[in-house]
Amino acid sequence: EVKPNYKAKPGEEITLSYPYPVRETELVAENIPLDFVYEDDYLAVINKPTNMVVHPGYGNFEGTIANALLYHFDNLPKRDDFEGRPGIVHRLDKNTTGLMVVAKTEKALVELSKQFFDKTTERKYHALVWGDVEEDEGRIEGHIGRSLKNRKLMSVYEDGSFGKEAVTNYKVLKRYGYTTLVQCELETGRTHQIRAHMKHIGHTLFNDFDYGGEIILKGTTYTKYKQFVQNCFKLL
């Protein structure tokens, strides 16, 4: 082993040790129902439910959208950078509900991937956030990368010292006093982008346990709603 500050020298051989076990089994088809909103010979649009992972990863090797797609379709194309993810050209977070486009042919895969890369597609999401958002609309810019305190979560790095560029445009749809319904349009597609960006500007997503959205912060103007909100959480 070497120290974290060790500088590699030319000609040295580096061996990496992975903390997680390697998944050797191939992706298998699973009879999981999918909600198809649209389908033709080239693509399909599905309504992804909450609490469902898009593709296999550490801790989630079964019960994913990818497993379900293999059952419903034969010979789905794969992107080189999306290994083991048949027909998938974009992703949604596990707890996000929304429409996903699935490519059924190689040509559709190439064209759809290019559209997402060139940012000619529009991705809009509705989110209920804590607080009365100050501006009717706004733009959040800040690199997003793994949190240094919790690797499962993402953090915003405004100075661009870490993470990848991320841009979220938001617009207020309705104000409820202690919460606000906003529409978020993404220019980039980073993991937990909306969740991390909205928390960054002080408006965590309602009931987002991972980012602190399940509680009202002490000392805020919303503390008086604490009992009411706690009762709401009991009903969720």
Question: Where do the model's predicted regions map?
Answer:
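RNA pseudouridine synthases
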Residues: 1-236
